[in-house]
């Protein structure tokens, strides 16, 4: 082969290959010099390669260069990666080990090949470049840098394979093991199958697995005791406060005269907290009174966390990293140390507390006429619970303390709530019919019961007060051009709207192509009393976009507000703390502590920490439900079809509030097709159909703890489209007379069968000698044959006469 090129790597290529092809350096230089993308054929022609082996070798080299992030392939053309932008992204890996890089600030993903996934864990932050677009139009990427490792420690079971020890993470999204030295195993005195906690020493590369060392053996712990710390580590949640952070938090004392300077004193006001029975940190207190000229005054006092968490201090850095408190089923991972979250920042009863206040005036009709924000000092008059207040509003005067001012305020709050409830309906804020649950636990952290949680009037009263303050804060920031993070909830995407519209039309309800909150709420109202309301509302909910934090106001679609933010929970949400700082800075005529690009980055970060917390909490809840259902394998329950897909039905059990799946193969002897419009699985042969809201009886077939999946088997469909389905008795044929032959056959079948003798042989029956046919029998046979022939001749003649007569009649008609 004649070479028509000068290769800077020619010597190295010649040492490695008998028949060298252009090196990677030469290929990149050639594409760069041509200043345009080149195909494989273009390069073959340029280098004048003629033999088939070298042509194929060049093709393999180009593919390898794409794989290694040196070239980008677009269709059949190759171009330099330097022309491709670098994106910040987060790694997401599913339970099958397939992964994508989700690009920041975009609704786009890049698929990652197995080689790229070797060097990352689920949740890692990376920089990626696009390398190719496949035939389905999906982008593939290359990891140029891992910028942040989410997982630093992990809990899993010790395993061994061919003398090599490793820990296999239990999280279904953890796709690769962490290797351990045999000496470390022996020193820690752990054995295969034990749960252990490991710290990662060397993170994985494209060529090697991660390595680590054992921190703690957890072999003596029950699985239910391990699941929360295991999840905390797997999601990279900060779980231990550093010593300097604890020291910072504990350095503050009870509010003194100096702390109260420049604050409005509200200690004589009958402010109270209203929270759940198990609440320990109290962010907010409320008070209401009727104004002399008509209307209402509402005071919403929020813990002044910004007084204690100072910018750039260790305490602030730790809170910023956490972003939010994480609420597991029976454990809270707080954003702030306990000295603040349950102490100085918590609006505990009968002690002075520093707060930020939203003081509002409302008209008789509930419209906000004015508001102001200011720092204050308060003294809570009572720690009330939702249950106490609800019972008091229902007529139990002993449910809350005998404090006249407190009772008067609670009564006024309830009157105002009745007014605000009407305004909520007028603006068409969405109120979905969903069932919230809570769990009770045993001593080892396992579920004892799953029970429905009811929202009473006290819950809704406090919710309306918080909405008033949050909306006022958003309007205040807009009016005064204060840089801050809005809570943004955008309208649904068109593709999601189409799915909802097709489904809602089948319910006989109108739904436009560009729906407003009014259109959504109309469907909610029209279906709220139906038995399948939760399933219908779940379809509407799934069409909603995910809310996020951002510096640009885009309104809140779900709540039907033009502007909205979070002001009321700074103990557990860092964005609320940022807003308090921004309002304080404005009141003091100082520049805002955060603005521009830094504010945008903050919005991205806190949206991510919120999602991380939600995913971690959901993962634990799902695991605990799976663990709980292990004791019910083989039992039958009644459930409601809550979602449908091509591969089966998702069913929520009525009594246990647990979700599982009935695979399409378990639905019966039919071929089922998924109908997107009606959200149904329809049998093509027998017409049986399964839709949202259908009631079914299932049997718990199996539980997979690692994958967090519960499998059901269908026992019986109990209802469809709101109508009960009665069990049908099997069809029975009508009785007919029994023939002689059947009688004799039955008698023959009922005769005792021959049994074996003691020797094991069956007795042999002697055959009767054959008897020759008599003359009589021969005559009878002959006669029947003759008779049969005569009968055939008669039938033929009769048929001929009938045809002749028909022909004559036809002729008469024509004439």
Give the residues covered by each predicted segment.
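Outer-membrane beta-barrel proteins
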Residues: 188, 627-629, 688
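Charge-lined substrate channels and their catalytic hotspots, especially those that engage the 3′ end
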Residues: 2-299, 306-351, 383, 390, ...
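A short macromolecule-binding patch
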Residues: 108-113, 174-180, 657-674, 722-728
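Electropositive polyanion-binding surfaces
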Residues: 45, 183, 192, 197, ...
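A generic structural signal for residues embedded in beta-strands
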Residues: 128, 198, 644, 698-700
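Acidic/polar residues at beta-strand termini and the immediately following turn/coil
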Residues: 103, 169, 363, 442, ...
């Amino acid at each position: 082969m004649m070479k028509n090129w000068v290769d800077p790597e020619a010597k190295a290529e010649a040492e490695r290959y008998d028949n060298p092809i252009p090196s990677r350096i030469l290929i990149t230089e050639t594409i760069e010099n041509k200043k345009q993308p080149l195909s494989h054929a273009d390069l073959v022609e340029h280098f004048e390669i003629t033999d088939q082996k070298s042509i194929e070798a060049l093709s393999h080299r180009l593919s390898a260069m794409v794989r290694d992030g040196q070239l980008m392939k677009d269709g059949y053309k190759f171009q330099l990666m330097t022309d491709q932008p670098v994106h910040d992204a987060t790694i997401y890996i599913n339970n099958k080990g397939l992964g994508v890089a989700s690009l920041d600030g975009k609704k786009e993903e890049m698929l990652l090949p197995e080689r790229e996934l070797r060097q990352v864990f689920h949740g890692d932050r990376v920089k990626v470049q696009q390398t190719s677009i496949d035939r389905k139009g999906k982008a593939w990427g290359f990891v140029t840098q891992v910028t942040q490792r989410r997982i630093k420690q992990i809990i899993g079971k010790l395993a061994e394979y061919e003398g090599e020890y490793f820990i296999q993470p239990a999280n279904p999204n953890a796709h690769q093991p962490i290797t351990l030295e045999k000496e470390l195993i022996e020193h820690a005195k752990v054995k295969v199958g034990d749960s252990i906690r490991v710290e990662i020493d060397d993170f994985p590369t494209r060529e090697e697995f991660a390595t680590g060392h054992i921190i703690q053996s957890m072999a003596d712990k029950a699985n239910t005791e391990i699941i929360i710390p295991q999840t905390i580590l797997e999601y990279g949640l900060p779980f231990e406060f550093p010593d300097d952070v604890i020291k910072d938090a504990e350095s503050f004392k009870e509010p003194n005269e100096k702390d109260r300077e420049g604050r409005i004193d509200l200690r004589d006001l009958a402010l109270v907290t209203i929270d759940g029975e198990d609440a320990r940190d109290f962010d907010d207190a409320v008070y209401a009174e009727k104004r002399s000229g008509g209307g209402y005054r509402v005071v919403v006092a929020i813990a002044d966390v910004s007084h204690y968490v100072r910018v750039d201090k260790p305490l602030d850095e730790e809170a910023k990293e956490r972003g939010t408190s994480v609420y597991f089923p029976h454990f809270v991972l707080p954003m702030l140390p306990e000295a603040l979250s349950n102490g100085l920042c918590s609006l505990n009863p009968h002690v002075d507390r520093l707060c930020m206040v939203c003081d509002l005036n409302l008209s008789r009709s509930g419209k906000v006429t004015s508001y102001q924000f200011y720092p204050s000092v308060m003294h809570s008059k009572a720690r009330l619970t939702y249950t106490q207040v609800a019972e008091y509003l229902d007529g139990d005067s002993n449910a809350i303390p005998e404090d006249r001012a407190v009772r008067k305020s609670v009564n006024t709050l309830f009157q105002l709530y009745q007014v605000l409830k009407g305004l909520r309906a007028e603006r068409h804020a969405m109120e979905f019919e969903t069932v919230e649950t809570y769990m009770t636990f045993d001593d080892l952290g396992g579920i004892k019961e799953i029970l429905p949680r009811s929202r009473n009037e006290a819950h809704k009263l406090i919710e309306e007060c918080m909405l008033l303050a949050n909306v006022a804060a958003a309007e205040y920031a807009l009016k005064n051009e204060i840089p801050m993070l809005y809570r943004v909830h955008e309208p649904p995407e068109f593709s999601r709207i189409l799915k909802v519209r097709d489904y809602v039309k089948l319910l006989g309800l109108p739904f436009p192509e560009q729906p407003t909150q009014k259109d959504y709420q109309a469907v909610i109202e029209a279906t709220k009393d139906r038995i399948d309301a939760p399933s219908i509302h779940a379809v509407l909910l799934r069409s909603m976009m995910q809310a996020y934090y951002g510096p640009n106001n885009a309104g809140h679609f779900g709540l039907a507000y033009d502007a909205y933010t979070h002001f009321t929970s700074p103990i557990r949400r860092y964005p609320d703390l940022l807003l308090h700082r921004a309002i304080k800075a404005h009141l003091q005529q100082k520049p805002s502590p955060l603005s521009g690009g830094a504010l945008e980055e903050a919005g991205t970060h806190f949206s991510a920490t919120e999602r991380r917390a939600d995913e971690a909490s959901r993962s634990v809840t799902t695991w605990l439900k799976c663990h709980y259902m292990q004791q019910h394998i083989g039992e039958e329950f009644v459930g409601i079809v809550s979602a449908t897909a091509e591969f089966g039905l998702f069913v929520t059990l009525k009594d246990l509030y647990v979700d599982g799946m009935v695979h399409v193969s378990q639905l019966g002897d039919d071929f089922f097709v998924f109908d997107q419009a009606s959200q149904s699985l329809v049998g093509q042969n027998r017409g049986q159909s399964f839709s949202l809201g259908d009631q079914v009886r299932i049997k718990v077939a199996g539980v997979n703890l690692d994958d967090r999946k519960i499998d059901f088997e269908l026992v019986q469909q109990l209802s469809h489209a709101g109508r009960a389905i009665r069990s049908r008795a099997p069809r029975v044929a009508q009785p007919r007379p029994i023939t002689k032959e059947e009688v004799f056959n039955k008698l023959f079948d009922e005769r005792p069968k021959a049994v074996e003798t003691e020797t094991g042989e069956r007795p042999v029956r002697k055959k009767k000698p054959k008897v020759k046919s008599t003359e009589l029998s021969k005559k009878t046979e002959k006669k029947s044959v003759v008779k049969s022939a005569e009968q055939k001749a008669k039938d033929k003649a009769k048929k001929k006469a009938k045809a002749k007569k028909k022909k004559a009649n036809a002729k008469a008609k024509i004439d």
